[in-house]
Amino acid sequence: MKSPRGRQLVLDLPHRSALGRDDFLVSRSNAEAVALIDRWPSWPTTALALVGHAGSGKTHLAEVWRRMSEAKIIAAQALARSDIPPLLAEGALVIEDAAGTDLDERALFHLLNLAREQNAFILLTAQEPPATWRLKLPDLASRLKAIPVIRLGLPDDDLLRGVIVKLFADRQISVDEAVVSYILTRIPRALAAARALLAEIDRRALEEKAEVTRNFVARILRELDQGSLFSDDEI
């Protein structure tokens, strides 16, 4: 069925990202972080902070560790309404966006103490290191300043190129190398930017029944408001 303008109607269904360890691409910008995650359970402490700006890949890397350790996962803002001890029942826990202003500091401090007592593991994710968080509880601030910080830098060209190629492959879109190179030079250095653009390319290619060529991508980039397209946080 076609729309009045002759374009194919496209169901806006979610695309499932591949988030396994084999799907996580490694380059100089993230190799140190990946190596430390892979060292689990031989971590130097029972808690680590995984830090990186939006689009750096921290959500994907945290998911890699969650699967590896069979950890539970919780948003930091949900700690206030959670029963704390059961969160460490599996021996591992991911706490996402731990630097939020609505963080229950006493709950987090309790979790860190429990992890130490039970030899369980906690991975905190945030955009900034714990030393910069505006905490009110002195004991928590002191404890967090002592935990190792895993930093993810913005993706370098090698990583971003690999991610673009992988995203096309995930969506079963065949493109020339020239298309990948063209995209690489025209998007922000953030994995979220690549995901957002590839999702739009996929949608438009299906809608228009078009081959994904350099000219097709160029037209999409010209027509899009890049500010809105590339402002989303990482998946």
Region spans (language model):
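A short, basic N-terminal segment
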Residues: M1-R39, P44, L206-I235
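Short regulatory helix/loop adjacent to the ATP-binding pocket of P-loop NTPases
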Residues: P130-K145
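Post-Walker A helix-loop "phosphate-sensing" segment adjacent to the P-loop in P-loop NTPases
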Residues: R66-Q77
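Conserved AAA+ ATPase "sensor/coupling" helix adjacent to the nucleotide-binding pocket
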Residues: I147, R161-S174
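C-terminal helical "lid" of AAA+/P-loop NTPase domains
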Residues: S181-T185, A192-L206
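Conserved AAA+ ATPase "SRH/arginine-finger" region at the nucleotide-binding site
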Residues: I147-L159
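Conserved nucleotide-sensing/catalytic segment adjacent to the nucleotide-binding pocket
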Residues: I84-A126
